[in-house]
Amino acid sequence: MIKIISKEKGKISFVTDMGESLANAIRRSALEIPILAIDEAEFYKNDSALFDEVVAHRLGLIPLVTEKTFTEIERCSCKGKGCSKCSVDLKIKAKGPCTVYSSNLKGKAGVVYDKIPIVILNEEQELELVARARLGKGIEHIKFSPGLVYYRNVAELHVEKDCDECKKCVEACPQKILKIEKGKAEYDVYKCDSCEACVEACKEHGKNVIKVEKANELVFFIESWGQIKADEIFIKATEQLQDNLKELGKELK
């Protein structure tokens, strides 16, 4: 069972009754989705205040639009030498005074965000380089990660009959999603993160009438860095998990 809670640009969250072991396997499989990122940089000029290595590190973390036409370099017919099927070159040629942004990267691969600052160039300072991007996986380096994938249990909040409705728990709720009406708790079940601030506030008041328990459902959150869509991350992660299980089955035979 999957029920969408919210879906917006770059983000999706849903409720599911899958077990935690499966959810964690999908989460980890997201790090095996091939993602395009800058892996090498050759500098011809760099008069900035930053070392080449620092600029190269920043380049690697710039999200690039990952097209489906690219092939992983290990599987490419060029046998790792690098060609148009498995890699793409991006160039920067800038002269100060200016701020060099991700939009200054010119090539056949687009950047997700135009205004990521790379380096500041003062008067007469220059930056000229060629960067090569390739497909990689998050298990190799975090720059190849497609986004943030995490989950938590749905919370169940119970109020005992002897609640005096002092509202101390309501005031303590950091997300302001809790109400106590006629001895019953009203709250957004999918926004409650089981922080138990309400429980602690109740104890400080001399009571112990609120309990927070885990339900048999999970809230799944996916936030994309922009290389691929958030829902694609989930789909590709499940496909990757299936592929891994098939490989495991072959090894066990």
Predicted regions and their residues:
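Protein-protein interaction/assembly regions in multi-subunit complexes
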Residues: M1-K253
